[in-house]
Amino acid sequence: LFNQSGAKYFWESLKTTGIYTFWEVVITLVGGILLALLFNRMTRGFNAMRSIVFMPKYIAVSTSAVVFMWILYSPAASGANQSEGILNYALSLFGIQGPHWLIDANTALTGILFLTAWRVVGYAMMIYLSAMKGIPQDYYEAASIDGADGVQRFRHITVPLLAPTTLFLFVTTFIASMKVFQSVDVMTGGGPGTATNVMVQWIYNLTFKDFRTARGAAVSAVFFVILLVCTVATMRFSNKNVNYDS
């Protein structure tokens, strides 16, 4: 781990994990609150649409990964034809040449994030929606009387009162995304090259494929410390900046 080669792979994996984590957190929080705002205004078809959006959370990660792997590219094909997945075929009908999603180092992580967005946004929407239902309508009515528009009500009422919910989603999503493994292992195996070689994938490869158990254990210990420090820092920040009073 601490020689030149090991340090290089460590920082590459940590960087890839950080990029993936950043985008998963953004997708979860932004997508979740936008969908919650939409569903909070719905009057017809609410239960059906809510179930459809939330359903991906119940599907196993490995199963979802296999489905998205076929959507993004065809593993049964060879060479350039592997990029002709269902999505690229649909794009070709409109004269658009889609990228080589999972076999191009520049787009492989994006392909995995498609799966992530499909799975997590519905869950975040349900959490945000439950919190929104608990906000007293008196606050909005008083703000309307004072002349506040929709954006101002959202900014000064909804966002502050959803801060504890946002913190919960941030912490749980951060931890889950930092230790992402199944979707990466099924869809790319850490490739092409090391483009999607996140930390847990690298630890798995070291321990169970290269049989370098000692190095895998060392990386695991360092990674655990990183997660612990980040989580403690987040909780300390929240204690000072998040208001838990209703």
Where are these regions (language model features)?
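A structural signal for multi-pass alpha-helical bundles of membrane permease subunits
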Residues: L1-S246
